[in-house]
Amino acid sequence: MTTINLKDSFKAYDVRGIVGETITHETVRATGAAFVDVLGLAGQTVLVGGDMRPSSPEFMDAFAEGATARGANVQKIGLISTDVLYFACGIENAAGVTFTASHNPAEYNGMKMAKAGAVPVSSETGLFDIRDLAQKYLDEGSIPTVENPGVVTEKDVLKAYAEYLRKLVDLSNIRPLKVVVDAGNGMGGKTTPAVLGDALLPALPLEIVPLYFELDGTFPNHPANPLEPANLVDLQKAVVEHGADIGLAFDGDADRCFVIDEKGNAVTPSAITALVAEREIARAKAEGNEQPVIIYNLITSKAVPELVEKLGGRAVKTRVGHSFIKAVMAEESGIFGGEHSAHYYFKDFFNADTGMLAAMHVLAALGGGNQTLSEISASYSPYVASGEINSEIEDKAAAVDRVRAHYAGAPVEVEDSDGTTFTNTEEGWWANLRPSNTEPFLRLNLEAPDTPTMERVRDEILALVRQ
């Protein structure tokens, strides 16, 4: 009998818990069994991989025990980034799981799951059903074994992943570039040499300067979360010191990628979204797609939909969160999607997100001409953004109401979708207030035509929120 409640570790999109407390050998084994039962995978192959966290190998074994007991064959694909799992699930048309807690601290681990074709498993597509059945197995103290349990095999998919990405974006003929890559001791330390280096494939015209490529799930240098500006400082310094053309920072499971220009300044994910959208629209039109669809979330710069429409594409706005983007990508036949959090989704990558492929598009744009990255990104960044500002506040609804009351009667449109968005059409600014689902935070994102307007509106709204 167990006292662990799986509701503590099963979130809306994935599983995350503290090793030995809310995620253990037993909970993972039960989850492996429930994964097979709920998704009907008996007799089929389930892919199992994991990141560099110390507990990942044991958890991969535990999941395999549960999955094979219920009749699935397990193919272990070893040490992988999360986008390698999506690639393998897509190319092999098989369901799978990877053990990672992304950028969470060292004491955490977790699971990201996908159905065949890299379709995400979330609370709305079976994750909570898996949780409930796993809880039943835990409470009963045993997992029934089928008459013909599955077998475990191993396969390395990293070279196939690297070849696949190189076919999507050809970097072989770009001008030579010096690229500093901060892997943050995460899985980018393994995928970067495979895709951009010469570890598995012929060398590209890229000189890679590695930062923190040693796989180490204790993150000895800095947290592997490039969304926090403090974690980009080492990369920014290195880009300037080495006279590099560009810097890339990956998070722990290497599905997100942040970009630094040659001056050491961060390039916003909105600018990267616009850059990649322009390249993908041109390619889709050349292939006969008359109005390619680009997906963006409501916190992305309005420069993105403006550019997409100017190029003859169609821009579709969605809520924040990868399951929403992936669902809309499929529904709308989108060719590319971008989020302010540096998640980038590609139709050619099974509608899944891959920071590496986005980085390759940036390298192709940079290496295909003579402009610097700061010059290129400036053309995609006509507006001034506040970045995401958190206010710790208990009564979030009352705070939003104060802002709503303040702008009543002004030329401000109010839209209640994924928080509340205020748009001033006369002054050309918009602001979104969105409550965090997991923390007592109200998040402000704001964009304006110039810095004085952005700062004035930002200070106005924060004063109302925090009073």
Give the location of each predicted region:
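Gly/Ser/Thr-enriched, mixed-charge loops and adjacent short helices
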Residues: 109-242
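Gly/Ser/Thr-rich active-site loops/lids in small-molecule metabolic enzymes
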Residues: 200, 210-212, 265-284, 322, ...
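Short glycine-rich phosphate-binding loop at a beta-alpha junction
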Residues: 43-51, 178-181, 292-298, 335
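Phosphate-binding and adjacent anionic-ligand microenvironments
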Residues: 246, 286-467
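Glycine-rich phosphate-binding loop
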Residues: 94-108, 113, 239-261, 265-266, ...
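N-terminal small/polar loop signature for handling phosphorylated ligands or for N-terminal nucleophile
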Residues: 42-109, 195-260
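An N-terminal, well-structured beta->alpha segment
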Residues: 1-65, 69-71, 151-177
